[in-house]
Curated annotation (Swiss-Prot):
It catalyses: a 2'-deoxycytidine in DNA + S-adenosyl-L-methionine = an N(4)-methyl-2'-deoxycytidine in DNA + S-adenosyl-L-homocysteine + H(+). This is Type II methyltransferase M.MthZI. It comes from Methanothermobacter thermautotrophicus. The keyword Cell division does not apply. It is an enzyme of class 2 (transferase). Belongs to the N(4)/N(6)-methyltransferase family. N(4) subfamily.
Length: 355
């Protein structure tokens, strides 16, 4: 098996390199409107935004202008997403004081409205709870009613589907779908509507411009979503690639990927992370298998994996195949190919299979 991964360092409001309806899954986290670290970026895209932040008493105009910039990208996302494809957007609301007025800016609502208005099915979303232990996390009047504010400690993982459920028309597509299944216990964990077991990523970046601009979700978040909403060999798009997390997760999961990133300063960091993918992927796949084996020891599943001969809980798990990249090469500037082999748990962890 082979996958291809391409990076374009340009504004994703124009993804003319991509054909219409060519992407199976979008996983991304855009800059959040009305969060101060992104003010400069949005102002570079539209100078009117900086003017409104300085001159106006409330932030509604700034909020709308920032979302208009994001919606240029969402229009392109809509164009390139295939029927049955899924668009997943991790976004947080913002709380901010403009002039004397403090309020919440509901970024997730504006994003839902965009895709709803274009006929997408709005699927149940996930609350990603990111608890803060900062001593200054309480806002407003402290212990005195009534002017304190609820602490904001979660983000949204919004999920949209284009034109109804995806159809798998050929036997090869149906076979790949079966081989891309996840374990029963993973399904129970991953498809919860509240995720509390993932923490945000603390960026330790040397470049001063990157420190200001980086905001990454953890690898596990992207890896889960890619396994939940795509099959091996699919094309995954991240129009706000940042440090490359979505691309790394796609490579580990045996999917192709395309990323767009406005800031060329991320190039070296992304390539260094790509270099670490081989080791990471092997660890991730073996962890999934070992966790499953520990689970099934107590569960005593009714069925057997056709490929690995360990027990599984349901028939839908019987054809699971897990691969990891054994090597990769850079085939041209900003384009990489990964080459895979199937995991052999019996060979690598024989002692774990005596169940």
């Amino acid at each position: 098996m082979k996958t291809t991964h391409r990076i374009y360092f340009k504004n994703s409001a124009d993804m003319n390199e991509l054909k219409d309806k060519s992407i199976n899954l979008v996983v991304t986290s855009p800059p959040y409107p009305m969060v101060e670290i992104w003010d400069r970026l949005f102002s570079e895209l539209n100078p009117k935004i900086e003017e409104t932040l300085i001159d106006e008493e409330d932030g509604l105009r700034s909020y709308n202008l920032m979302h208009e910039e994001l919606e240029k990208v969402w229009h392109e996302v809509d164009r390139v997403t295939a029927p049955g494809g899924v668009v997943i957007i991790n976004i947080g609301d913002a709380t901010r004081k403009i002039g004397k007025k403090f309020q919440l800016y509901p970024n997730h609502v504006r994003t839902i409205d965009f895709f709803f208005d274009r006929g997408y099915q709005v699927l149940p979303f996930i609350i990603w709870r990111k608890q803060s232990n900062k001593p200054t996390k309480f806002m407003g009047s402290g212990m005195l009613p009534p002017n304190a504010y609820v602490t904001h400690e979660h983000e949204y993982i919004l999920i949209f589907r284009k034109e109804g459920p995806r159809q798998f028309k050929t036997e090869e597509e149906r076979k790949l779908r079966r081989e891309s299944a996840y374990f029963w216990e993973e399904r129970n964990q991953w498809f919860s509507d509240v995720w509390t077991d993932l923490t945000g990523v603390s960026q330790r970046l040397n470049h001063k411009n990157l420190r200001k601009r980086a905001a990454a979700y953890p690898f596990e978040l992207a890896y889960r979503l890619i396994n939940m909403y795509s099959i091996m060999g699919d094309w995954v798009l991240d129009p706000f690639l940042g440090t490359g997390t979505t691309m790394i997760a796609a490579a580990c999961a045996g999917r192709n990927s395309i990323g767009y990133e406005l800031d060329h300063n991320f190039k070296d960091l992304i390539e260094s992370r790509i270099n670490e993918t081989l080791k990471l992927s092997n660890e991730i796949v073996m962890r999934r298998i070992n966790d499953h084996i520990e689970f099934i020891r107590e569960k005593n599943g009714k069925y057997y994996s056709e490929n690995y001969k360990f027990k599984v809980t349901t028939r839908q798990e019987q054809d699971i195949r897990l691969y990891y990249p054994r090597t990769y090469k850079k085939i041209k500037n900003n384009e990489f190919e990964f080459f895979y082999q199937e995991v052999n748990p019996k060979k690598e962890r024989q002692s774990k299979l005596n169940i």
